[in-house]
């Protein structure tokens, strides 16, 4: 696991599968996503390595219902006064009240999807609570005016979070960064057309720092990279 300060107040937590991010406000910490089941101790250690205490965590925002994003949420939500937030359309899946929909895979995605699913641990997700359900345009209460951006397609209730004052985007799995460094629309989507439209919507934002659920964060040229990728997606 790596813990890297991307810009002041923002740390990147590289987990064994997927990523989490830690944002610091004067009144406490916000965690974006929580990794696979069993990730809570790793994230607690990451918070310490970032110079803070797990007890300072005030909210956990979940970008969508997949296990590599909500797996640690049940444990983390018990650390103290931690509010758990997610989009209303994914909330039933996160709470475990309904099974989440499977992706509509393109033929070229199937080998990668099968490989990824074989590598995931068998430990089941303990469904966490969701304290607050969000919709597009809601303010989750961190980052000097962060805004929830609905990006349906990867899942019905996928969310990104945009911090206008800091020009930081937490894209979840609505976007990704490939091994070659290129920004791309996320894969394994329940609605491929919807995912492409949501990705293009993100490209309209003024982005200085882009944080992905999979792939390295982008701290230079993010806006141009998104615009170029969106043009290819629309073509």
Question: PLM features: residue spans?
Answer:
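Short Pro/Gly-enriched beta-strand edge/turn motifs at strand-loop
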Residues: 1-8, 116-122, 142-144
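Short, glycine/charged-enriched secondary-structure capping and boundary segments
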Residues: 45-47, 74-78, 98-101, 166, ...
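Divalent metal-coordination and catalytic microenvironments
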Residues: 9, 23, 33, 43, ...
